């Protein structure tokens, strides 16, 4: 049977309490994820970091 390579992670805004949920491949992306996404509370793009 195949092992689970994908993990559900939470992306938390660096400037507010807004969050996104996404899936990442544990084999290909070993470090923590950082993405620039739209913050709905601040109404602008900010950096979202992986939180566990």
Curated annotation (Swiss-Prot):
Q: Lineage, please?
A: Bacteria, Pseudomonadati, Chlamydiota, Chlamydiia, Chlamydiales
Per the record, GO CC terms? cytosolic large ribosomal subunit
Question: Pfam families from the entry?
Answer: Ribosomal_L33 (PF00471)
SUPFAM superfamilies referenced in this protein's UniProt entry, alphabetically = Zn-binding ribosomal proteins
Give the GO molecular function terms: structural constituent of ribosome
Q: Which organism is it from?
A: Chlamydia pneumoniae
Q: Which residues are in coiled coils?
A: none
The protein's name is: Large ribosomal subunit protein bL33
Gene3D superfamilies linked: Ribosomal protein L33 (2.20.28.120)
Q: List where the protein spans the membrane.
A: none
Which terms under GO biological process does the entry name?
A: translation
Which cystines does this chain contain?
none
Family of this protein = Belongs to the bacterial ribosomal protein bL33 family.
């Amino acid at each position: 049977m195949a092992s689970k390579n994908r993990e559900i992670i939470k992306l938390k805004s660096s400037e507010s309490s807004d969050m996104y949920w996404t899936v990442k491949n544990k084999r290909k992306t070993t470090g923590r994820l950082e993405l620039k996404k739209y913050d709905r509370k601040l109404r602008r793009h900010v950096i979202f970091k992986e939180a566990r």
